[in-house]
Regions:
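Residues at the starts of beta-strands that form the adenosine-phosphate
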Residues: 11, 40, 128, 151-154, ...
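NAD(P)-binding Rossmann-fold cofactor-contacting core
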Residues: 148-177
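Phosphate/diphosphate ligand-binding glycine-rich loop within oxidoreductases
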Residues: 3-120
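Glycine-rich adenosine-cofactor-binding loop
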Residues: 16, 105-107, 126-147, 157
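Adenosine-phosphate binding glycine-rich loop
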Residues: 228-230, 234-290
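Rossmann-like adenosine-cofactor binding region
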Residues: 179-254
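Short helix-loop-beta connector
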Residues: 122-128, 225-227
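Residues in the short beta-alpha loop(s) of Rossmann-like NAD(P)-binding domains
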Residues: 18, 158-162, 237
Length: 290
């Protein structure tokens, strides 16, 4: 890819650590080239304790915006001047828009999830979800699904550090949305079975089953699956986890996190540029072989 950079070229970037593996620079630079937009997207390896300095530098230099990956998603919310409703509830963000020095924090991971589900031909608005996990990806999904109109969400997590934080987020969602959200201890399989039985969608928001530990699965009892259930795994390496493989064998429709990644990027791109990312081109060029 060749790009002619001038004194007018705007800056977009990714902050976090590590970032060298990220497909975001390729996605966003390709999108800008396709649409004739004069931006360049770079990746900067920035540890959490250096985020404040990095943000002030980007603000001062007039960068149009940036994405944030781990470990900076929580601290970035505190560094922003304004936060979106989803970011305020979750306490995390993955996108910053810089409007003349005023920084607004957004989270587009949940937006990417909702679009990926719709892309699979599944409508979960007004229906019930069972969500496994309460970390960053799961929280983004939880918040956006509740804001967008999913009727009921049962969240299952072990009693770790995320559990107490999840209790606070669940309380906010029950207060501010029409969605009924309940947090459960993952240790009770019968409660989980009952939740899945009348859910339209089961989401694995954890890293269980990710490469290289591909034979691990978060659902060990496959009798919990039913043919009306859509099973979504945020993992995209491998494309088909053991969870998805066994769900498919049980007659479930399935989807992975590959297009969630694409569509969260498209949502960030729209916030910065006001333009729709040419997702079909990006999908074909960077995601067809994943």
């Amino acid at each position: 890819m060749s790009k002619h950079i001038t004194g007018h070229t705007g800056l977009l970037c990714l902050l976090g650590s590590p970032v060298a593996h990220s497909v975001s620079p390729e996605m966003h630079n390709e999108a800008c080239d396709q649409l004739g937009l004069d931006y360049s997207y770079l990746a900067f390896d920035v540890p959490e304790d250096k985020m404040p300095q990095a943000v002030e530098g980007l603000r001062t230099m007039g960068a149009r915006g940036w994405n944030i990956t781990m470990p900076g998603k929580n601290i970035m919310c505190k560094l922003a001047d304004k936060v979106s409703p989803a970011s305020e509830i979750s306490g995390a963000c993955n996108t910053i828009v810089n409007d003349n020095g005023v920084l607004t924090a957004y989270t587009t991971d949940g937006v990417g999830f909702m679009r990926a589900v719709a892309e699979n031909g599944v409508d979960i608005i007004g229906k019930k979800m069972t969500l496994l996990g309460a970390g960053g990806a799961a929280t983004a999904i939880l918040v956006q699904a509740a804001l967008d109109g999913v009727a009921e969400i049962n969240v299952f997590n072990v009693r770790d550090n995320f559990f107490a934080r999840a209790e606070e987020i669940v309380a906010k969602l029950n207060e501010r949305t029409e969605c009924k959200v309940t947090l459960h201890d993952f240790s009770d399989p019968e409660v989980l079975r009952a939740s899945i039985a009348d859910s339209a969608i089961l989401v694995n928001g954890t890293s269980v089953g990710m490469a290289p530990k591909t034979e691990n699965t978060i659902i060990t009892d496959t009798t919990m699956f039913h043919k009306d259930l859509f099973v979504f795994d945020v993992i995209y390496n491998p494309q088909e986890t053991r969870l998805l493989r066994e769900a498919k064998e049980a007659g479930c429709k399935t989807g992975n996190g590959m297009y969630m990644l694409l569509y969260q990027g498209a949502a960030s791109f729209k916030l910065w540029t006001g333009e729709d990312m040419p997702v079909e081109i990006i999908k074909e060029k960077y995601f067809s072989g994943k």
